[in-house]
Amino acid sequence: MYIDSLEFLDEERDAWHPFEELDGLTDEQLAVEQPQAHGWSGRDLMGHLLAWQEIALRVARELAVSESSATRAWSDAEWAARGDAMNDELLAEWRQLPIDEVRRRFRTLPGELRGYLTVVPESRWLKHPEHLKFFLTETTDHYEAHRADLAVILRGAT
């Protein structure tokens, strides 16, 4: 599917780029809940995406030094058993953070994940079908699944 990790990382970066518009909204605009976006606010969308990027970052850190990832096994099992309840708990954690901390992580976490993926041997993620599927699910596929939410939130901010 991908020739090398840089191809994946370029695609991921391009897919993430539209979401960076959220950082340009005021705190007040980020707080407005949008019924057509799961009832989420811009801040909620930021937290939801970042929560899963954070899990992906932990997996990348583990794969940098090992053939497997306990975090990935945990995440897969939790999702299979609890699905939306897991999402709700992650979102509740992000809602407790000060908005400045959400913004700081929004500006740094995606780049940190990309950075870690550059040091993970490609055989452990890019050329490993299950691990690649995991990273796609938590990045580009996840972003695509929430593009409509992003559009609703950005329209609601104007």
PLM features per residue range, with description:
Residues 5-15, 99-106, 132, 136-139, ...:
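Hydrophobic packing residues in well-ordered alpha-helices of helical domains and bundles
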Residues 1-30, 51, 55, 61-62:
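Alpha-helical bundle segments that constitute or directly flank the non-heme di-iron/ferroxidase center
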Residues 15-21, 112, 116, 149:
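Solvent-exposed, charged/polar functional surfaces in cytosolic regulatory/catalytic domains
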Residues 1-4, 37, 91-98, 127-131:
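Short amphipathic alpha-helical segments at helix-loop
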Residues 13, 28, 85, 127-128:
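Short hydrophobic/aromatic segments of transmembrane alpha-helices and their interfaces
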Residues 31-81, 114-158:
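Short, contiguous alpha-helical
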Residues 12, 78-123:
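Acidic/histidine-rich alpha-helical segments that form the ligand environment
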